[in-house]
């Protein structure tokens, strides 16, 4: 009896340990954040929730709470984040990224015979010169967060942001959405690569900042398109995507395809 009681006590402690944790997960592209939650929930057979979503097109770091660990997620709300993204200035979509729903415009890139510019973008019959790195840097400098001053940038109409108690994407699906602006914080940027029409950036931003908004705004300022074709979250607060080892994982079936979610338990 004593051995059985000890075994039951040990089992209860072990189960409590397993079902009270935070996980850092790698979300793959082209599945939803809720698909990630579903796979992890099935793996642990416990309630699971997240500290913030990623767009279906995006990949990278997601923080999940498992079991009693869901109560710890409130401490992660509002943390700064960093991303790597690629903006395509020859593309314009209704979602501001490659996961367009109904509207997609692609503009032709034309090689230049002029010495002062490498190429042009052909848009609505006009030839728009490819912007220089200096032009792009000046624009990004102008929206950096300074002296507690946030900048107003256009919200993507296809977003989960609520307006008048309703998600914006619901009106967007009906063609009724209006472009709204929202205060956003951009702390720092680094230009990783630029070969027109593609611009690759690393961005450090405040919570609630839409990277799609930055890409679209840049394109509008330059008279070009501006849609994300790649987006990866690389950090949330002190948690880094690079800290996740590709060893511990959960598998699940999403729309007939097996997907793998790699994760690491975080110390609370």
Per-range role (PLM):
Residues 1-2, 258:
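Short, intrinsically disordered low-complexity segments
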Residues 3-4, 13:
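Polybasic, lysine-rich low-complexity intrinsically disordered segments
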Residues 10-268:
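Catalytic/RNA-binding core of pseudouridine synthases
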């Amino acid at each position: 009896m004593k051995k059985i009681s000890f075994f039951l006590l040990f089992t209860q402690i072990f189960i409590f340990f397993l079902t009270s944790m935070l996980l850092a997960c790698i979300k793959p592209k082209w599945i939803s954040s809720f698909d990630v939650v579903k796979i992890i929930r099935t793996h642990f057979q416990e309630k699971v929730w997240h500290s913030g979503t990623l767009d279906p097109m995006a990949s990278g770091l997601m923080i999940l709470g498992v079991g009693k660990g869901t109560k710890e997620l409130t401490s992660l709300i509002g943390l700064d984040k960093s991303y790597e993204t690629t903006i395509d200035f020859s593309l314009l979509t209704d979602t501001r990224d490659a996961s367009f729903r109904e509207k997609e415009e692609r503009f032709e890139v034309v090689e230049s015979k002029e010495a002062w510019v490498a190429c042009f973008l052909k848009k609505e019959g006009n030839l728009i010169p490819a912007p220089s790195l200096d032009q792009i840097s000046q624009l990004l400098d102008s929206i950096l967060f300074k002296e507690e001053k946030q900048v107003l940038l256009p919200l993507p109409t296809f977003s989960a942001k609520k307006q008048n108690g309703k998600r914006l994407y619901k009106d967007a699906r009906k063609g009724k959405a209006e472009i709204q602006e929202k205060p956003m914080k951009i702390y720092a940027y680094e230009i990783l690569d630029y070969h027109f029409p593609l611009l690759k950036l690393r961005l450090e931003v405040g919570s609630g900042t839409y990277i799609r908004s930055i890409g679209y705004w840049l394109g509008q300022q330059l008279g070009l398109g501006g849609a994300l074709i790649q987006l990866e979250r690389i950090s949330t607060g002190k948690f880094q995507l690079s800290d996740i080892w590709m060893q511990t994982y959960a598998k699940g079936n999403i729309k007939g395809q097996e997907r793998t979610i790699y994760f690491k338990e975080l110390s609370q």
